[in-house]
Amino acid sequence: TTALISLGSLLLLVCDGGRALPEPQACGVVPEAWRFDCYPERGVVVTRELCEARNCCFIPASSSPPALGRNGVPWCFYPPGFPSYSLVSVNATDLGQTGTLVKTVKTYYPKDILTLQLGLLYETDNRLRVRITDPSESRFEVPIAVPKATEKASSPAYSVELSNEPFGIIVKRTSTGAVLLNTTVAPLFYCDQFLQLSSSLSSQYIYGLGEHRSSFLHDIHWNTLTMWARDVATSSLLPDHDSILYPLTNLYGVHPFYLAMDEGGTGTAHGFFLLNSNAMDVVLQPGPAITWRTIGGILDFYVFLGPDPTSVIGQYLEVVGYPAMPVYWALGYHLCRWGYGSSNATWDVVKNMRNYGIPQDVQWNDIDYMDRSLDFTFDPTAFSTLPDMVKDLHSHGQRYVMMLDPGISSVQPEGGYWPYDEGLRRGVFINHTDGSTLIGKVWPGLTAFPDFSDDVTHEWWYDNLKRFHDKVPFDGLWIDMNEPSSFVDGSTVGCPDTELENPPYTPGETHTHLSHLTSSHYNMHSLYGLLEAKASCPEAYVRKRAFVISRSTFPSQGQYSGHWLGDNRSHWKDMYTSIAGMLTFNLLGVPLVGADICGFSEQTEEELCVRWTQLGAFYPFTRNHNSIDQKPQDPPAFSPAARSAMKQSLLLRSSLFPLLYTLFHRAHTHGHTVARPLLFEFPKDVRTYGIDRQFLWGKSLMVTPVLDPGVDYVVGYFPQGLWYDYYTGDSIRSKGEELRLKAPLEHINLHLREGAVIPTQRPNTTLFVSSGQPLHLVSSLSEDGSAGGELFWDDGESIDTFETDQYAHVVFTVVKVPGSTNTITFTSSLPIASYITVETASFYGVKMEPTRVMVNSHDAAFTYRANQVRLGVRSQRLSVF
């Protein structure tokens, strides 16, 4: 049972020099786990005098000093009864309730807003929205489209209780009475540049809150997660000492959403989303409790009731938008590096991949393809053959992706650089308050930054893309440095000494001023990557589905782009943490995600690169990328044995493309995850809650990679049930236990959960070729002989095929016919698409050798191996309808 400490109890006061101080006995009743920090400013040694000047309790913590990246138990904390808002009126509305909040005692932060408007919106049976706003003055609200409820939920899965004095909101799950949100645990702050909301958590099991380097399951023991989009190489954040994980510093994206499992292993889950784009700190403490501190905007948040984890994510994505359906080749193998040096050197790598028969769908170039790092150019000398290379890629069914940065050079001769000249003419750049163009510094030198919140900028950006596409017919875009990043503080003239630049509280993003590496647009800063992605979708000029990979992300990003996890290192630890990043972004609605395979910085090692390629074959987005001046790490650069192991991993991925494509369809239409944590499928198994060394594709295919050097085995957890080795069909009946699995260097362990049918196909070196191959179906039978699965299929690149019914949806069902132990009926349903055929099928879990196998009433050849309980059917190609 979670103990909640309400600050609504009586406050005993004593006088000390004219200040009202809390009575020591009142301070002593607050357990350490429920101390909410009254002096959160960084870089300050908090003394008793400073603390008591805020009328707060000061008690040194009993525990030892905190570890790196943690705050530790606060010594200065709010006493019971600390002044907060009061709820003075409540009225019913068509959608819920509205109320007025009043504060009579000002806080220690400037510009308190003393009267607030409360809005409770019962939007659906599983979604509650709460808005706390300033009724007298408009404040910034995040400009992303969210659904507008038109009627109040009729049978909500939640109840809402309001505390009048102090004001607080308590949200409970009606089916169990579990408390999901209780904001009475600490005072509410609502100042012009400081908003703070605290709440209890339903358990210690909390996920999401990107983007940071951490384990998938967050540690709630005094961790602070800062959210403010920032250009920082993750490789610079990773200490080598094994006893330390990672400082939870803020990275490229901002995602103020969490999923929490309810207490007690009930399997129920809920979600919370704060729709705010300003810089913020999110503090986790062992109460369990959470505090949100932000320096602008409003408090606009949602509670999602689930009740299971998959439903929570679907409900969250109903608000911010389902991810786009990717173009088919986006799911192939991508190859890149910074420092190819020339188009011919790039081309040679592609040719080597072909010579060795290693799958490759997409070739990329980093910034070195540009002429003097200028966007929308290519080096006329070193990359003179770039158009020819792209033409060659297209002739082989391959694609080309290039990098773009948002910074536009501002120092080229007038009339000599159309992007800047035309941008200046149209007024698309971010300005100083005096109307002059804000100038920063990025790779090409002094630069101006497009204002992607303006539709005029979108038109200018499109014109630039179209002009360049006419010269180099690229197929997708890699948008980088879009936090946005600048190499100078704010601009070349620095930052003004104003209240805006010096807020009373600065979230901890490790720099002295928030203007570092950014311009000073607090409200819009963390939205920049999202807005650029919206402007960058090349559908209009390639007339196919867009492919965009963005470094900076924000809620709703999945509608417009995928994401790679940033500049990692060629270290085993980095490979491990990539799984947590991949799973987290699947929760956040950006399923097209992956890390730089083999590592971006530092020299990779052959064993590491083999193991990472095996893992990377199961990233939803799989790309090998490394830095300038590092040795090559494309597969042909390694020994024959390593090269062969990498090739087999990539062929394996290619063979599983029908499954992966179908999973992305489910993500696009239902908000499902593609790469999925085990807890989503086994929410009542508490042992799955912390697993981030294994994961699932969809419901049924479990991946157990090797993440440590020098081993030929791996330990994996198998939830209760029947599992089959994907390669052999050998069965494992687990009670919910860890098992040691053989894992020689050329092998990655895959297991199928009982009751699945997954579609596969014969692999090839490009998805353009392999996607036309007949299907091979793999069925893993349950104890009762049943299994099921599906296939979504279309042309792979046309826009809105699902919305316009230009697709096939096949449902596979395996059942045991009553009265027979050896007969299996295989059925499917399909509205169109006679071009889909099934060539072979395998059934794992057939306990007795059949005497006869028939397909469409005709005898079919088969093989049976009792030690593998596998049935293979080979016949004439079978049309699935």
Predicted features, each with a name:
Residues 40, 50, 55-71, 75-78:
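Extracellular Cys-Trp
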Residues 1-11:
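Classical eukaryotic N-terminal signal peptides for Sec-dependent ER targeting/secretion
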Residues 82-100, 112-155:
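A low-complexity, Ser/Thr/Gly/Pro-enriched, surface-exposed linker/loop concept
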Residues 21-30, 76-85, 90, 177-754, ...:
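Catalytic-domain carbohydrate-binding cleft regions of carbohydrate-active enzymes
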Residues 97-101, 120, 130-132, 157, ...:
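Short, well-ordered beta-strand segments enriched in hydrophobic/aromatic residues
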Residues 145-147, 726-745, 852-875:
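Solvent-exposed beta-strand/loop surfaces of large extracellular or lumenal domains
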Residues 19-48:
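Secreted, propeptide-processed cysteine-rich mini-domains
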Residues 244-245, 747, 752-858, 872-877:
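Accessory, solvent-exposed terminal regions and/or long lumenal/extracellular loops of proteins
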